[in-house]
Every structure is written in structure tokens, then in C-alpha cells.
């Protein structure tokens, strides 16, 4: 599942598990070799879910780099997508390790909710200034809401919708985003967040179930 990247990084000496939506793959010369839509696939969800569960089992903090607008629309993926998405959501919701989400691009609908959003337990959610957070893309939303409008009217309505429903400022006002950070300052804020969460202690019935599952797997 090359559309979902997982791995370990170091932030000020701390080991952090990173999960990211991948849109472009570059070769050794720095040229684009492969491109993906920023959507969730069944294989990508399973890959991320297993990685998050692994990190949680060993109390490794998790960082999510989110840029997702929906789901992969193909027969093969759709057969398994619901189960895989539930697995991913459960992994994030049940994980008691520190969880930080950075929105780097688009974050739309239930696909975003599953990618370590506030709704399923992210400790901190940061976003870049040009990020988009909402139920759906403004252009698609206005085509549904104003089906009979002209192209010029749709363009105007899309701007209004984007300002009211899709901007990162609106998401911050509603509590979905904790802080809007400049890309150049991102590392500093991530380090601060994980240092603050270093002694995090969380207990829920869900986390206890996951803990017992981890113990079973490890033994």
C-alpha cells in the first residue's frame, strides 16, 4: 500500500511512529516516479492500523500527517474498505500512546475523521495555514446545493462555502484544530507537543481491551 507511508522518525531524540497519506513518490534523482490521489484505500487503512497498534503496544508516540479527501473508488478496494476503515478507526481510538495530528493539505469528511482526528482521540491537532478542513470540497458541495446555478454563481458560492465551512480558521474556531502553525515552525511545535505528552497516562475500557490484545500477541 504505497499510498500510505509508515515509519519511525526522531524528534529531539524521541522515537516517534509516523503515519502519512502519500500523494507522490520520488526516485533517487528527486524526480516524480509515481502519483496517488489523496484518498484512503483498504490496504492503506490496514497498513496504518497495524502500525498504530504496534506503536501503542510499545508505548511509542504516533504522529499523523494528514492529507485526505475521501476513499479509493474501485471494486477491489470497496469490498474490504468498510472493515479496514473500522480497523483503522479502532486502532486510533483505542491507542493510549501520545497522538498528534498535523494536517498538511486537505482533511475532508469521514476519511479525515479516521486519520487521527480530535473526534477519535488525538491529543493535539495542528494544521498548516493553507489546509482545508470540512465535510467535503467546496466545489463539490455547491454543485449539490445549487444544482441549477450558472458557472459564475457556483464559483462565487464555492468561495463563500470555503470561507464559512472549509477553512482552517473555521476548524480552529470550532475546536477541531488546536493550532495553526507555519510549515517552517512545524518541527518545533511537534517536539513541544510530544514532550508535553511524555508522561501521558490514559485508561479507558477500549484501551484495556487493546492492552489485553497486545499482551496476548506479545506472549
Per-segment meaning from a language model:
Residues 213-219:
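A short, hydrophobic C-terminal helix/tail in secreted or cell-surface proteins
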Residues 1-212:
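Ligand-binding clefts of soluble mixed alpha/beta catalytic domains
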Amino acid at each position: 500500500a504505497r499510498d500510505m507511508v509508515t515509519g519511525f522518525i526522531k524528534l529531539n531524540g524521541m522515537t516517534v511512529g509516523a503515519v502519512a497519506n502519500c500523494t507522490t513518490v520520488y526516485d533517487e534523482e528527486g524526480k516524480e516516479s509515481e502519483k496517488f490521489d489523496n484518498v484512503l484505500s483498504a490496504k492503506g487503512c490496514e497498513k496504518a492500523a497495524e502500525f498504530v497498534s504496534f506503536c501503542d503496544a510499545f508505548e511509542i508516540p504516533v504522529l499523523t500527517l494528514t492529507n485526505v479527501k475521501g476513499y479509493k473508488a474501485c471494486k477491489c478496494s470497496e469490498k474490504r474498505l468498510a472493515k479496514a476503515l473500522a480497523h483503522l478507526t479502532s486502532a486510533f481510538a483505542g491507542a493510549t500512546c501520545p497522538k498528534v495530528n498535523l494536517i498538511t493539505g486537505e482533511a475532508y469528511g469521514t476519511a479525515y475523521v479516521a486519520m487521527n482526528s480530535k473526534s477519535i482521540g488525538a491529543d493535539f491537532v495542528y494544521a498548516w495555514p493553507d489546509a482545508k478542513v470540512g465535510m467535503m470540497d467546496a466545489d463539490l458541495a455547491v454543485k449539490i446545493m445549487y444544482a441549477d446555478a450558472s458557472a459564475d454563481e457556483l464559483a462565487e458560492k464555492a468561495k463563500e462555502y470555503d470561507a464559512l465551512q472549509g477553512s482552517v480558521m473555521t476548524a480552529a474556531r470550532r475546536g477541531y484544530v488546536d493550532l495553526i502553525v507555519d510549515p517552517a515552525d512545524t518541527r518545533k511545535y511537534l517536539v513541544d507537543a510530544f514532550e508535553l505528552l511524555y508522561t501521558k497516562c490514559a485508561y479507558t475500557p477500549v484501551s484495556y481491551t487493546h492492552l489485553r490484545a497486545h499482551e496476548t500477541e506479545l506472549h
